[in-house]
Design a protein with these regions (language model features):
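Nucleotidyltransferase catalytic core that binds NTPs
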Residues: 1-227, 236, 240, 256, ...
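Short, basic/aromatic-enriched C-terminal tail that caps enzymatic domains
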Residues: 242-271
């Protein structure tokens, strides 16, 4: 990958990177489309990163659809598909990890210890391997976006972090590779996340700014769904993930499947 990127650099081409873990869906492809519009060359990485999964998480059963992914990416006209192995990324003896403090400590960072250390490490390695000018992430993973933005700024990586809107199903459910785990009833129940965010956005649009009341609105909507178990509901600053703020964020278990979603409450409702 480095040799390919060097050749593009010699030609004066700009490079866009779309990091993925595979199991691609329309949300990923929207990132690819944005990268194609804004760069001469587009690289999509497909790598299920083992060090961002904790004990008991779904590394072994994470959805994988290699042939389908390759077909989608070829059809989208990407210039390179980067599929390193775990041994390529973390050879024997590798002991360096990238740790982002502050923004990575709360919510997802607290619920999944070591997760953002794994994310920050793999993103740094992917950016280095591809010499990307721009890297594309979805707003659905809002805290990951904030962590990567902090990483890029603090390490002077010279890469622009581009954030693209969350892509949703017609009923509001945010697209996620983990949606494949949901049974029929669970899939119907999962709409409670976007419904809760909509209720909070509606209240915010009417002038509600009290974080306790906004959190209560989120909790009530989730707790009204029998199949849902709330892990957290918070309203945070989009850059620091401290409170108070203007981004409503949720983590909810629907059956055994853990889903996250968020919404910028400053956007008009509906929006």
């Amino acid at each position: 990958m480095r040799d390919i990127a060097r050749g593009w650099r010699v030609d004066g081409s700009t490079i866009g990177l779309v990091p993925t873990m595979g199991a691609l869906h329309a949300g990923h492809m929207s990132l690819v489309e944005a990268a194609r519009r804004e760069n001469d060359r587009v690289v999509v990485s497909v790598f299920v990163n083992p060090i961002q999964f904790g004990p008991g998480e779904d590394l072994a059963r994470y959805p994988r659809s290699a042939e389908r992914d390759l077909s989608m990416l070829r059809g989208a006209g990407v210039d390179a598909i980067y599929k390193p192995s775990a041994a390529d990324m973390y050879p024997a003896g590798a002991s360096t990890r990238v740790v982002v403090h502050g923004v990575a400590d709360s919510l997802e960072g607290a619920a999944r210890p070591g997760h953002f250390e794994g994310v920050a490490t793999v993103v740094t390695k992917l950016l280095t391997a591809t010499s990307a000018d721009r890297a594309y992430f979805g707003q659905k993973d809002a805290q990951q976006v904030a962590v990567v933005q902090r990483l890029a700024a603090d390490l002077d990586l010279g890469v622009e972090i581009r954030v693209c809107p969350t892509v949703r199903e017609d009923d509001g459910l945010a697209l996620s590779s983990r949606n494949a785990y949901l049974s029929g009833p669970e899939r119907m129940a999962a709409v409670c996340l976007s419904r809760a965010l909509g209720h909070a956005a509606e209240a915010y649009g009417r002038g509600e700014r009290n974080p306790d009341r906004l959190r209560a609105i989120l909790r009530k909507a989730i707790e009204s769904e029998p199949l849902a178990q709330l892990e957290y509901a918070e309203v945070v600053d989009p850059a620091t993930f401290s409170t108070p703020g203007s981004i409503a964020v949720l983590a909810v278990r629907i059956g055994k499947t853990r889903l996250i979603d968020n919404r910028d409450l400053r956007l008009p409702y509906p929006g």
